[in-house]
């Protein structure tokens, strides 16, 4: 069982949605967090909403599609906090169109962020996580096992992410590093231009994902839930 007090989590895409909800929950449970966004102003605004104490919250600019950007961000985390215990690979985008309408740039942006971006985050953080015997949480989607119309790019990225995550789980467990893939259904976030509102009350809330991660971190070291599907209890109409 991980004692969460003063442990450090690095959360990509942490300025809103699931990432921000996870950061808030981990912070409430005594952890320190580093959150990233492609835009530093967004990361700083989110960090300020969490805490004014820079010893607890660090805001960083990083583009997960760039390996060097992630290497620089992880270096900043370890220099600031002195350690890294948890990676939450959450940054993601969605482009939805029929194959006739899907552009090459939409395809590239989706794969570079949702799949290559996680590869970059893992590669950049793995040495620090081996040292701490830490935990990697990848945020996939039910779209990682269920395909749908106009979802070719998104499905490909999330199917790939599930496979990647399960493979590295086998690679890394011998070092004491755990890997879990969380596959949420409908979550009340700003994803794909949506603005959360009262009609989203039936959906999973970002803090629910944060609570799930907290529970995972506190499980006995001998126990490894490698893949978790989570849905709203009662789907909305």
Regions found by a protein language model. Give the residues of each.
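Conserved glycine-rich cofactor-binding loop
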Residues: 8, 15-17
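Conserved glycine-rich Rossmann-like NAD(P)H-binding loop of the short-chain dehydrogenase/reductase
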Residues: 29-45
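The beta1-alpha1 cofactor-binding region of Rossmann-like NAD(H)/NADP(H)-dependent oxidoreductases
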Residues: 40, 61-73, 104
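Substrate-binding pocket helix/loop in short-chain dehydrogenase/reductase
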Residues: 98-99, 106-108
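Active-site helix of classical SDR
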Residues: 122, 157
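Residue(s) in the substrate-gating loop at a strand-loop-helix junction
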Residues: 141
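C-terminal helical subdomain
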Residues: 177, 181-182, 189, 198-237
